[in-house]
Amino acid sequence: MGLDDVLARVAQAAEAAGREPADITLIAVSKVQPNVRVKAVLQAGHRVFGENKVQEAQGKWPDFRAAFAGVELHLLGPLQTNKIKPALELFDVIHSLDRDKLARKLADAAQARGACPPLFVQVNTGREPQKAGIDPDDLDAFIARCRDDYALPLAGLMVIPPVDDAPRPHFDALAEMAARNGLAGLSMGM
């Protein structure tokens, strides 16, 4: 399935859900993809990509950004506190804010840098012990701390539903949590 096919499916799903296709951003996940495949998608005109690891992104995206204007890069995977500085330099959006220690260190690094990309709070709606993310019961208080104590630019919420669950209930729950907290962005993957 090519990029045009994927974009057509996204547009059909948006229309079926009563949404505007233009309101949905497709993040092409480029983790572990060979550079030749990423380059082909860039040449096809797509500009929004996601990576799971800071180190992998550092190895491929500076050259792609030099060759292709308008690239927007999203960090989708866990962010270790020792990788905050390079993450802030490389990524346009971070989708994996999931704990107070990370929020505090992001705030400190962003203040020193003078800027912070938009952030999505990762929510563990399935309460899976092996997955990162804020427990839904702790979310509202965490968002308040991120706003009030750390002054972080929260853009929305992110979820990766459990593999064995139907995703719709997790997506619906995330949308309700985002609305309750005045967050417009929803990052719903896999």
Question: What do the PLM-derived regions correspond to, one by one?
Answer:
Residues M1-M190:
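Conserved alpha/beta-domain cores
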